[in-house]
Amino acid sequence: MTSPGLSRRRSLLLGGVAAAGAAFTMAPAGANPRNTAEGPWAVELFTSQGCNSCPPADVYLGSLAKRPDIVALSFHIDYWDYIGWKDPFASRATTDRQRAYARVLKQRYVYTPEMVIDGIGHDTGRDRGKIEALLGEAQRRSPRRATPELTRGSDGRLAVRLAAFPLDGEPADVAFALYDRRHSTPVASGENQGRMLDNFNVVRRFEVLTRWDGAAASWSVDTADLQQGQGVAVIVQRADHGPVIGCNKLEPMVSG
């Protein structure tokens, strides 16, 4: 969906991250480091609960989120909040991220739903074949990945480690995301009035940790606020919203 001048989108610093102290069991760290030939690759969905075109893309992102070769993140934009329903997960920072991608990818406008694939291309997500084609293109362009190794200690801090990687003089941004794995929201007004909307991997906290020069490095991130039902991801991409060159995720164990 598009709007006069700019389309329906949502932003980054999402509110209400759960309080610290809850018991949380992460997936085994040994399963996390990946062979560089295996990805993962990043899929970022820009969406809004106020847009009636978005629910099918939200469901599709939920299926992509189950794949070990994909880091799937849902960013809720805020520019459709005026049309009858205020998305509880939206923020201006998310909208700013989408607009930055639009500039880099030379889009005339922003729209929802929009899936940005590994920072190299975009589509609505309605045609899954187009998304798979973009994923294939991402794999061809970036067969060797700067895949971060993620481990979380008993002190609640996330260790992020990157091996040396040839950046050819072009720096990269290392960004951290904390996300809720699923939300079901009854929508009382707006275009989706009366519907129960399911959203997946909803980003609640997003920050650029550093600008990286390609030398072996490590960082520590405070994740004491992490709760059951949440996950964390790290995205490494060419500076200023360029192509993604590596990413990884760490999620809680799911029983049953």
Which residues does each predicted region cover?
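N-terminal secretory signal peptides and thylakoid transit peptides that target proteins
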Residues: M1-A19
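Short alpha-helical interface patches
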Residues: L6, T25, T223-Q227
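Alpha-helix C-terminal capping segments
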Residues: L12, L61-R67, V221-T223
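C-terminal segment of classical bacterial N-terminal signal peptides
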Residues: A22-P28
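Active-site-proximal cofactor/substrate-binding loop regions of enzyme domains
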Residues: G30-L105, Y109
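Short, conserved sequence motifs used for protein processing/export or organelle targeting and
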Residues: P88-R108, I120-G256
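A conserved catalytic-core signature of glycosyltransferases
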Residues: T112
